[in-house]
Every structure is written in C-alpha cells, then in structure tokens.
A protein has these predicted regions:
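Cross-family detector of peptidyl-prolyl cis-trans isomerase
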Residues: 1-124
Length: 124
C-alpha cells in the first residue's frame, strides 16, 4: 500500500452532530488500535462551522504519537481512533463536550466548536 497523502476534509452538510461520529473512509488491514496502545497518526483538523483548518500533523511532517486512553489527545479524538486498523483513514466528528468545550485553545477554534478530523492510522 502506498503512503497516505494529506486529505481534503469535507465537512458534512446540516447541523453539527451532538454525539461522537466516526466514519471509515478507508478500512485498514493492519493491527487494531486499542486502549493502552501507542498510536502514530497523521491528521487534519477543521471546525465544523467554518471548515477552516486549525491544525494538521501533515504540515509539520511529523506524525502525532499518543497512548490511547492516556489523556494526551482530546477525548473525542482518542475515542474516535479506537477500533481503527493500521492503514485506515477515518473521519471523526467531535462535539464540544468531547473536544475543547467552552475553552478556546487557539484563535482558530472558537469556544463551543464541533471539530472534524480526518485521521490516518500509521502504526500501533
């Protein structure tokens, strides 16, 4: 399988979901990501309301590594990666309560934002 490339993120139309929503864009055929494992991912994050990118590991050319369930990633991102298989690409829509809530970690993310991530699982 060829190396993944940075995806374009298509924000779904309509109202932002109020629950964590995951949709496999590509189903991987490698190991499954489970709590306690260290996942290595590339991702793009945009806000649901504007579709504007607020963060991406692709531009840093450095995958993000985190322990599933370890508290290093926002809750919805962490939960959304669980169950992915290496080689997969998944859209994860994170409601505010599982994202940054009423806080704003950056001017690019207004308080109360629903977040949309497209995540490629590189390894566990």
């Amino acid at each position: 399988m060829s190396e993944p490339t940075k995806p374009e993120v298509d924000v779904p139309r309509g109202d932002a979901p109020t629950e964590l929503t995951v949709r496999d864009l590509v189903v991987g055929d490698g190991a499954e990501a489970k709590p306690g494992m260290v996942a290595r991912v590339h991702y793009v994050g945009v806000t649901f309301a504007s579709g504007k990118e607020f963060d991406t590991s692709w531009d840093r050319d450095q995958p993000f590594k985190f322990a599933l369930g370890g508290g290093r990633a926002v809750k919805g991102f962490d939960r959304g990666v669980r169950g992915m298989r290496v080689g997969g690409r998944r859209e994860i829509i994170v409601p505010p309560r599982l994202g940054y809530g009423k806080q704003s970690p950056s001017p690019l993310i207004p308080p109360g934002s629903t977040l949309v991530f497209v995540v490629d699982l590189l390894s566990v």
